[in-house]
């Protein structure tokens, strides 16, 4: 594939409210939205929609969120050969509160994302070796990030690490 992206896949649960609650406070919110998310999954979808040939490497749970995510990847024409399904952990979930100014508070339960291992990366070696670029983030175990980066570098493949300080 043209691009190999490895990182997180979450289900985002978003509640909009006038303001963010203070610690220990319950407030009434407005609209509730449930979307597919995770930095890696968002980038894979964006690249595929722009016409990129994308292989995504991640772990999801064997649950309704994982099933819906896998279905979405197929609709977006993302290669899911290396999307691992683990029964030991649920799919990742992010609870997001957004106020009327667009400020947010996010809590992530990594779930299956936290099980992406160097063994998973080794299994995905054919996709990494065929890619022209490997795009990664830091929402999965660092050992799998460094392992994938070294694997790509060894074959002269461009590595792009997208870092956010709040992850």
For each predicted feature, which ranges?
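Acidic-glycine-rich active-site phosphate/pyrophosphate-binding loop
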Residues: 12-24
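Conserved small/polar residues in nucleotide/adenosyl-binding loops
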Residues: 1-7, 163-167
């Amino acid at each position: 594939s043209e691009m190999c992206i490895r990182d997180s896949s979450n289900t985002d649960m978003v509640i909009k409210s006038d303001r963010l609650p203070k610690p220990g406070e319950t407030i009434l919110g407005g609209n509730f939205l449930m979307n597919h998310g995770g930095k890696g999954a968002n980038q894979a979808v964006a690249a595929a929609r722009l016409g990129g040939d994308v292989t995504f490497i991640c772990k999801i749970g064997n649950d309704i969120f994982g099933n819906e995510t896998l279905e979405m990847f197929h609709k977006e024409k993302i290669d899911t050969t290396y999307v691992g399904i683990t029964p030991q952990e649920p799919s990742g979930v992010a609870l997001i509160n957004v106020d009327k100014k667009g400020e947010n508070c996010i809590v992530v339960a990594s779930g299956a994302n936290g099980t992406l291992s160097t063994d998973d990366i080794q299994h995905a070696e054919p996709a990494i070796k065929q890619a022209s670029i490997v795009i990664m983030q830091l929402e999965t175990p660092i050992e799998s990030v460094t392992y994938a980066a070294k694997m790509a570098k060894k074959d002269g493949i461009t590595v792009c690490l997208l870092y956010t300080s709040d992850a």
